[in-house]
């Protein structure tokens, strides 16, 4: 034991000065972590231009370049042009904001549709798919240019806390798909057009000061609200207009039995049928769907002629339709009105 003790002691003595001069990487091997390199700077603003004058030529390239799971807003400025893309904002690309210069000159377009050669269906035909939370779009057009060929979605939104301002959604059947339960979506000063069920889905969505334009005789809203949801589609201070080909249009019909759709202070054109609502060929839906109006105006406003299973809200009932209440959920969210 004495031999071993002096052996180790002798070995340690000459090593002491060396230890004092050990570099950081060597020290890490002794339990001291090396200093981490500084993270690369986070790019919070990018520009897309089809002529190559921006950071990227396509919107998808810019989205792909944004930081994953960002906790701050990443703004992508989009120059005027027609962008022929099947754009996806995946779930890990959070807090992305797309800003165009003018919705009429900044257009994202596609033409996929149910039954096309690629085998698309309603759930894959969209031109733009938003899966990420905290997404915002301003001054953009989302278009499905397939024409009247069946289901052809322009914009499909799954993510929570999605906001669209001064945007246009162009298409025919199934133009706008606020898709899933638990998703809260806000549309302000937007233009939305279509033919059959052109605003449809399960999400909770509010439409403020939007123009809702029917292109032919059919149905506007096809909510699929679940019985767990207190709110479905809420239209506030909107204008319901129509092409000359549309003169018999329903406010909505229930895609699922517990559909909820409410119009508050909306101006209804003459194309809206006096009955107002359709039961989708199932009388049982009349007992479960919630369809209501408050202070509708215009030639399409006919409260006395509405189907008996719909409702005309009182002033007190209408007060419940605030953004704070509608978007309450498990986490608070109140977009700027």
Which ranges hold each PLM region?
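Bacterial N-terminal signal peptides that target proteins for export
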Residues: 1-8
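Sequence-level preference for short, compositionally simple segments enriched
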Residues: 21-337
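Bacterial N-terminal signal peptides
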Residues: 8-18
């Amino acid at each position: 034991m004495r031999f071993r003790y002096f052996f180790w002691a002798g070995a340690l003595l000459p090593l002491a000065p060396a230890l004092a001069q050990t570099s950081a990487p060597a020290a890490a091997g002794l339990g001291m972590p090396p200093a981490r390199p500084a993270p690369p700077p986070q790019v919070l603003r990018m520009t897309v231009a089809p002529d190559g004058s921006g950071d990227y030529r396509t919107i998808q390239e810019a989205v792909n370049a944004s930081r994953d799971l960002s906790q701050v807003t990443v703004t992508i400025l989009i120059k005027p042009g027609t962008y022929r893309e099947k754009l996806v904002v995946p779930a890990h690309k959070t807090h992305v904001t797309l800003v165009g210069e003018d919705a009429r000159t900044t257009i994202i377009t596609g033409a996929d549709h149910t039954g096309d050669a690629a085998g698309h269906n309603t759930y894959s035909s969209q031109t733009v798919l938003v899966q990420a939370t905290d997404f915002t779009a301003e001054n953009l057009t989302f278009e499905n240019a397939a024409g009247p060929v069946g289901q052809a979605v322009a914009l499909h939104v799954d993510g929570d806390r999605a906001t669209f301002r001064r945007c246009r959604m162009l298409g025919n059947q199934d133009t706008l798909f606020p898709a899933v339960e638990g998703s809260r979506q806000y549309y302000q000063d937007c233009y939305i057009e279509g033919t059959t069920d052109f605003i449809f889905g399960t999400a909770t969505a509010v439409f403020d000061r939007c123009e809702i334009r029917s292109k032919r005789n059919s149905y506007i809203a096809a909510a699929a609200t679940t019985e767990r949801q207190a709110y479905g589609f809420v239209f506030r201070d909107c204008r319901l207009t129509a092409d000359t080909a549309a003169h018999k249009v329903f406010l909505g019909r229930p895609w699922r039995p517990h559909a909820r759709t409410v119009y508050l202070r909306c101006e209804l054109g003459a194309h809206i049928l006096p009955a107002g609502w359709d039961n989708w060929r199932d009388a049982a839906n009349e007992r479960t769907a919630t369809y209501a109006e408050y202070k509708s105006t215009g030639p399409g406003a006919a409260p006395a002629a509405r189907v008996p299973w719909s409702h005309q809200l009182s002033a007190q009932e209408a007060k419940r339709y605030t953004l704070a209440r509608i978007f309450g959920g498990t986490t608070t969210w109140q977009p700027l009105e």
